[in-house]
Regions:
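C-terminal motif of bacterial Sec signal peptides marking the signal peptidase cleavage site
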Residues: 16-18
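Beta-strand-rich domains and repeat architectures in extracellular enzymes and scaffolds
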Residues: 36-69, 84-96, 242-244
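Surface loop/turn motifs at the tips and blade-to-blade linkers of beta-strand repeat domains
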Residues: 38-43, 84-88, 123-129, 164-171, ...
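Conserved beta-strand positions in repeat-built beta-propeller and related beta-rich domains
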Residues: 58-64, 102-109, 143-147, 188-192, ...
């Protein structure tokens, strides 16, 4: 065997390995929050959805049978600016804004409730399965249903367009709850989890795990009083809260 033949035999396996390898996924970032301040949350709020409106007020969607509501309030003064109560047959869930309108999910009723700016209900739409979290990418509404799947919904008709399976390091991220769309990412609460997950909604890949250990949760001892509620303020700043919490936490993600 010639020298060139021997060299080809040695190099060939390496070449095949190189050709068949796939690029490794980028590593998941591990971030945390810094608490910048607090504000009062309206009392008796089983928080299911939270968003900042164009006037820097907060929209709050709450749950529980017979107690669910949609409310606009000022985080600076704590004043309620508008409020509507859901019919007792609905358990309220996630909310999001689409122009001058607001959509609110219901848990098991398969109904999305549409409101005008003054929180007057103007329409309804139906969907299959449960409703948990909701946010607006600018093109689609992203909806969670407690699984590891994000559902892409039409912002006008609420018809389902497509779905994306969410994974963390290749494994399904189950129990996705409240959602907040920010730029090309979606920030998600996961039920019974003190982390927040930043997700690429096009691929479903979790790009960052954000610890909220800097928030003192020691007073919230009821198992149901979990972290739930993300509202983007600007840049890397957010309002965070939870179910039946008394406070909103103004945080910076870093």
């Amino acid at each position: 065997m010639s020298f060139l033949s021997r060299a080809a035999c040695i190099l060939l396996p390496c070449t095949l390995v190189a050709c068949s390898s796939t690029p490794a996924e980028p590593e998941v970032e591990h971030l945390s929050v810094e608490v910048l301040g607090t504000a009062s949350l309206p009392p008796n709020s089983f928080t299911q959805g939270l968003e900042t409106d164009p006037d820097s007020n907060l929209l709050l969607g709450t749950g529980q049978w017979g107690e669910s509501r949609l409310e606009r309030f000022s985080p600076e003064t704590g004043d309620t600016l508008a409020e509507t109560r859901l019919d007792n047959r609905y358990f309220g869930e996630g909310i999001t804004q689409t122009g001058d309108s607001i959509w609110q999910l219901t848990w098991k009723s398969g109904q999305a409730l549409k409101y005008d700016h003054d929180l007057r209900q103007v329409d309804t739409a139906t969907y299959s399965g449960e409703g948990w979290g909701l946010c607006n990418t600018g093109e689609d509404l992203l909806m969670s249903d407690g699984s590891a799947t994000l559902r892409h919904m039409d912002p006008e008709t609420f018809a389902e367009r497509s779905t994306t399976d969410v994974t963390l390091e290749g494994k399904p991220l189950e129990d996705i709850n409240e959602l907040e769309c920010v730029g090309e990412s979606v920030y998600a609460n996961v039920w019974m989890d003190d982390n927040i997950y930043r997700i690429d909604p096009s691929s479903g890949r979790v790009t960052a795990v954000i610890s909220t250990d800097a928030i003192d949760k020691s007073r919230y001892t009821n198992p149901d009083d979990v972290l739930n509620g993300i509202a983007h303020i600007k840049d890397d700043e957010f309002w965070l809260t939870g179910k039946r919490w008394e406070e909103l936490f103004h945080v910076r993600v870093r």
